[in-house]
Amino acid sequence: MLNVIRGDYQNSLASINLALNSEDSETAHYAASILQDVLNDFRSKVQEKYLLCQEENEEQVENCVKLVEYMNPILEQQVLTGLEQRSMTQKMQEVLEKAWTLDKIKISSTVYEKVCQRLLEIKDYEKCTLWCDRAMEQYPRVLSSYTCQLKLYFSCGNKEKFFQVMQELRKLDITIDNETLELIRTFM
């Protein structure tokens, strides 16, 4: 709750969500009020930014990418209802599709990684596969392209493709981070 007092509430929503179940009714009420305010602000800004993404101008691609980057911190905390989480993730994917169609070069490897992770969370494996493939096509020598595929195949239980991606990764001179190593250990 100290993060909230300092104003760093957007990255603390999961903690605020936990405080909703506090035995102290005042704490629970305060947490509910903050969470409701933050989520209402989030919904409003998403709608505002979404409308900017629909405007056909020279900033359209940047607006789409910025919306994805804006949505991700809230979506990754999974504080929305399941239905709204799914809807917002689909909207995130939709605006990234628009950016990709217009100028895929402006999409960074981290943005691909974010959308893949959110799609995995809602178990939309078909769309996640599409974005994993696009990330690999555009960033074939970047670790996140491989970790996205590894996470996808891990989530689907597809050992054959998981090990195929792992072998491809081994052939490259890419430093593997601890998260990827742990994923590989878990699946073996």
Where are these regions (language model features)?
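Structural detector for internal amphipathic alpha-helices that build alpha-solenoid repeat scaffolds
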Residues: 2-7, 18, 29-37
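Amphipathic alpha-helical repeat scaffolds of TPR domains
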Residues: 29-36, 40, 56-79, 94, ...
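Short coil turns that delineate tetratricopeptide repeat
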Residues: 58, 100-107, 139-141, 174-175
